[in-house]
Amino acid sequence: MAAECGSGNCDAWAARDPSGILSPYKFNRREVQSEDVSLRITHCGVCYADVIWTRNMFNDSIYPLVPGHEIAGVVTEVGADVKGFKVGDHVGVGVYVNSCQDCENCNSSLENHCSKCVVTYNSVDSDGTVTKGGYSSHILVHQRYCFKIPADYPLSKAAPLLCAGITVYTPMIRHNMNQPGKSLGVIGLGGLGHMAVKFGKAFGLKVTVFSTSESKREEAINLLGADNFVISSDENQMESLKSSLHFIIDTASGDHQFDPYLSLLKVGGVMVLLSFPSEIKVHPENLNLAARSLAGSVTGGTKDIQEMINFCAANNVYPDIEMIKIDYVNEALQRLINRDVRFRFVIDIENSFK
């Protein structure tokens, strides 16, 4: 292997440098505190954020770095003051594991917008330790950031809900995109985009998928049940849809034009950006003259997360996943870079650390 494995009470895979190559690693998790929930991780989704931080793309990576923030597992221990969780419960942990718990955002269940929010890996927690994520055998979190998963909902499918799912669900609820009969455009058909289609159909929307790749048509229509598929570079197709959509969810990575999509919105329509292009350029008339809105969003608060999990369980909404073992994770990350996944890798943690 590329590095020493180390010692500690938790098995994991970690990146040691900006090459992003992961290899076996051991470290110590803290002891269970009064409001902690300890869980044995069974599954962890693979998010593009794992590529970004293992490779130090934002120049802030802290090595050794254990990625993973789409975590599902089984409770093994709870602190003395924990309420609502017990040993054996199925639970999930998402993008963040701490916040100040006392600011306006925290008091409004918008912990993801707390200025002291601590993310699940590569972040300095309140005790000064660096957080390490779900590519590991177990994790401890304060009960506030732990979420119940119904016993009959597969943990392998639950894992991607904790990032891909909530990143889409929160803006859809915030902007009232759950109105049956209305129309939704989804730009991009990756991990986030496919969840936008699934939520859209579950909400009773008419869903149109936009892609630059004709190869996505069959996935969009036949696999995911979208109502329409449009090649976004085809001016005639785009022109035919002007002023036809109530909502657009933009999951496309990289830089792209916004005006062609904004012109597809009806009067008062809303387009929500979930990615991070280097810049946004729009003509004001595309917004002002039709009272359209361009909004942004990132993950969701604790109330939304539990609500989303419950909604998925009640409405049979399941991410489409490809299960892998931890020793395949380097190949999986490269395939993710190459956009070669349908639609989310999930690491079978419980059968990888034996």
Curated annotation (Swiss-Prot):
What are its cofactors?
A: Zn(2+)
Which residues are noted in the entry as Zn(2+) 2-binding?
A: C100, C103, C106, C114
> What GO MF terms are annotated?
cinnamyl-alcohol dehydrogenase activity; coniferyl-alcohol dehydrogenase activity; oxidoreductase activity, acting on the CH-OH group of donors, NAD or NADP as acceptor; zinc ion binding
* Annotated residues for binding of Zn(2+) 1: C47, H69, E70, C163
Q: EC annotation?
A: 1.1.1.195
Q: How is the cofactor bound?
A: Binds 2 Zn(2+) ions per subunit.
Sites binding NADP(+) sit at 167, 188-193, 211-216, 251, 297-299
Assembly: Homodimer.
The family line of this record is:
Belongs to the zinc-containing alcohol dehydrogenase family.
Q: What is this protein called?
A: Putative cinnamyl alcohol dehydrogenase 4
Origin organism is: Oryza sativa subsp. japonica
